[in-house]
Structures are given as structure tokens and as C-alpha cells.
């Protein structure tokens, strides 16, 4: 992903805390979070793959959301866990740039897959008669391609400018992962261009999906209020409320971290904020989308009954 930097061949990740008494409790806490994330997302991927009645556009995007959450949790959490049990959590320069690239690829992809899911719900609720035509397999694949293209473009933009920087001899990165802002703090050269890229690219990666989602849900809310059936209105609200919770957690914590002036957000507070979109959201997404979802519950019962009779 990147050649070694002549000034700094490696970094030391500070981790989440420097208090020895908190390290082991935090290790087991985040190990538990990671296991729940893995089981939840792999379970949802398996359920969607094995049950044909879930092979719809909504679950096509949910399948990819779970895949993204699984992947970027795997990019971040294992290295974070190492920081709790080792004196120095060392990561090579190339390893750091690789982690940065894949973290950004998956996190940007998630922001756009959430907007694709909002559009899917808009079509399903506001134009149900045109749903199968509008959300055809070809359209779904094009939307998914757009999601991953935006993820690649965002990750490449940040990483390409990051590898051009010269880093200071102080190798300590005040974070539990290689993220943009803590790495910029370690640069001995001007970071003006990088900060401009952060402002533009993050603005697009948060702004465009957020506007898309808000417009979609404003139209959905307007349509729901016109539904005469109480049961139909309740079902529509139930379907959308879970998505709104996930979106609020993800974009709220991301915007708080990246779009606030660094002078107003000390890095230690930034680490806590980043826990929401790196650890908490990937863990909660399978629960949010499945606990109140009748289709997923039916699929789980069918899968368990098949396995018990096999």
C-alpha cells in the first residue's frame, strides 16, 4: 500500500488509555464488543444468503452493510486490543497506511450504503407500485458500484496525500488506530493540503449521504402520514425508525470528529467520539436491523429449524 517513510519507519499507537488499571477491563470489554460484532454481522450475512425470501433490494443493501461493518471492525479492533496488553503497540509505516486506507474505504462505503438504503425505503413506501421496476437488480448493482467507487475514491484521496508527508521523530500517535487527524499531528511538513482534502472529501462523504437521507425520510414521513391504516403506518414507521437510529449514530459521531475545529476537540475526546462509528455502530447495526424485523426473525426460525432436522 505504501513504501516505508525515510523519517519514520514505524509508529507507536497510544491506545485508548494510558492508565494500567483500566487496560485489562477495557480489553475484555472491547473483545466482547468485537465478538458480538462478528457474530451479529456474520449471522445476518448468513441469514440473508440462505433465505430466498430475503433476496430483495432492502436485504441486498443490508447484506453489504453487514459485510462492510464486519470488514472495517476487523481492520481496527484487533490492533486496538493489542494496545491493552502490550507495553508498546508498534505498527509499521506501511501497515499504518494500509490500515488507514482500508478503514477509510469501508467507512466511506458505509456512509453511501446508508444513503442507498434510505433511497430504497423511499421508493418502497412512496412509490410501491413502481418498486420492482425502480429497484431492479441492475439498478441495485449500479448503486452498489457507486458506493464502493466513492469508498475507493475517498480512501485514495486521503492516503495519497498522507504518504507525501514527512513525519517527525516522535513516533507516538495519540489514537488506537491510524486515523487522519492524529497522523497529521505527527507531520513535520505543512498539512494545509491534507486539511483541505479532509474538509472537501469528508464534507462530500458526510454531506451528500446526509442530504440524501434527510430528503428521503422527509418524503417518507409525508407519505406515512397519509396512510389511513394504523397498522400500515405503524409498519412503515417501524421499518424506518431503525435506519434513522443507525444513521444518527454513524453520521453524528463522524461529523463531530472530522468537521469540528481541532482546537475545539482535543484528541482524547476525539478518540471517545470515534469509538461510536468504529466500534459501537458496527456492533449495533445487526441488532437494530434485526430485533424489530419480522422477516429476519422468520428467517432465523427457518434456519434454526433446518439445522435441527439435518
Swiss-Prot record:
Keywords: Cell membrane, Disulfide bond, G-protein coupled receptor, Glycoprotein, Membrane, Olfaction, Receptor, Sensory transduction, Transducer, Transmembrane, Transmembrane helix. The chain crosses the membrane at residues 28-48, 56-76, 99-119, 141-161, 196-216, 239-259, 271-291. It is a multi-pass membrane protein. GO terms for cellular component: membrane; plasma membrane. Its main location: membrane. One of its GO terms (molecular function) is G protein-coupled receptor activity. It comes from the Eukaryota. Disulfide bonds join 96-188. Coiled coil: none annotated. Glycans are attached at residue 5. Belongs to the G-protein coupled receptor 1 family. This is Olfactory receptor 8B8. It comes from Mus musculus. The lineage of its organism: Eukaryota, Metazoa, Chordata, Craniata, Vertebrata.
